[in-house]
Amino acid sequence: MKKFLSLVIAAMAICPSVFAAEVAEAEAAAEAAPQQSTVEKILAKMPKVSGYLQTGWNYTSNDKATSSSFQAKRLRLIVDGNVGSKVSFRLQIEAFNGIAGSTNGNGQKNIQVMDAFATWAPLDAFKIRAGQFYTPLGYENSDISPATLETVDFSNIVYRMACRNPYEYNLVDYGRDLGVMFMGDVGDSGKGFKYFHYDVALTNGSIPCKDDTNKSKDIYLSATIRPFKNFNIKGTFNWGEYTSTKLAGGTGAASTVEGAANKYNPMTRCVVGAWYNDPNGIDIRGEYGFMNSKVKGEKVVEERGAYALVGYHAGKWLPVIRWDMYKDNINPLSANNYNRILLGCTFQPIANVKVPLNYGLSLYNKDVETALGYNKHHQIQLMGLFKF
C-alpha cells in the first residue's frame, strides 16, 4: 500500500511539470508562426507606395549675376508591385520636372513619368526588363538615386552623358529609355553578395518617352565585378545611331558636311569606374566617361568627363569632398568646360530624413572666361530630403 501511495504522489508531482512544458511549447509555436488576418493578407498583395520630397534653398553667384531662391527640387512617387510570383513592376513619377522646354506655358514645373517597366525574374542569373527604365550607364544613373546620393546633385557624367542625347534630346533629362534589358547576378560568394552582374539592353535611344525616329536601336553592354563585399568595378559601353532633332529645350547636334543626311548619326558612349563603400566608414568613388560621334570624317560630338568623391560615414554625419571636370571639345567656350570642387556634409537625424549642405566652386579657363565674362562660379545648396 505504501508503495502504491508513493507512486501516486510521484505521478501527481510530475504531471504539472509535463503539462506546463507542453503548454510552453505550444505557446512558443504559436508565437513563432502568427497567422495573418484577412486584411493583412490583402495588404501584403497590394502595391507598395513610397517616394520622397527634396526641397530647400539654392544660391549662385559669379561676377555677372547672383541668385537666391527656395527650390522645389524633386518630388518622386514610386509604386512597386508584383504581377505574379516572378513578375514585378515599377512606376516612378517626378512631380517637380523643371527640364528646359518641358515646363508649362507659365514656366512652372510639371509631371514626368520616369520609370514604367515590368521585370520577369525566373533566376537570379537571368532577368528580363521591358518598358521605360534607367539605362546602366555609370553608377550614378543606375546604382544610386537622389535619395541615396552623397551630394545634392550628380556629376556631369550623369547629366550630360547618361541623361542627354546631343542629337535627339540636347538637354538634360532623367537617363531613361524605352526598350528591353537582360540582366543577372552570378557567382555566389557565400557572404551575401554575387561576384558578377551584367546588363545587356536594346533601346530606342531618344531617352524620353518617345517613339524611335529611325530603325536603328541603341545597344548597352555593362558589367560589374565585385571581388569583395564593399568594392566593385563597373564598365558600360553604349552605341547608337540618331537623328538630329530640334526641340524647344535644345537644338540637336548636326553634321555640316555636304550630303550628310543627319538621320543615322553614329555615336558611342563609355563610362568606367570603381567604388568602395563601407556603410560604417569610408566611401570612395570615381568614374571617367567619354562621348564621341564622327559623321563623314567630321567630329560632331566629342566630350569627356570625370569625378572623384571621398566621404566618411560617421554615425548620423557624412562629410564629403568631390572633384569633377567636364570638357566639350566641339563647344570649347561653353560653361560646360570646367573644373569644380564640392565640399559638403549631410546630417541624417532619422532614417527617412537627410539634410545635405553643399558648397561648389566651378573654375573656368581663359577662353571660357572671355566668353562668359567670369572665371569662377559659386553655389550653395541647403536641402532637406524626406522619404515616405
State what each model feature region is.
Residues M12-A13, A95, Y139, G297:
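Alpha-helical transmembrane segments and their juxtamembrane interfaces
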Residues V23-E27, I42, S61-A65, G84, ...:
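Outer-membrane beta-barrel pore domains
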Residues T38-G205, T213-Y220, T224-I233, L309-V320, ...:
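Outer membrane beta-barrel
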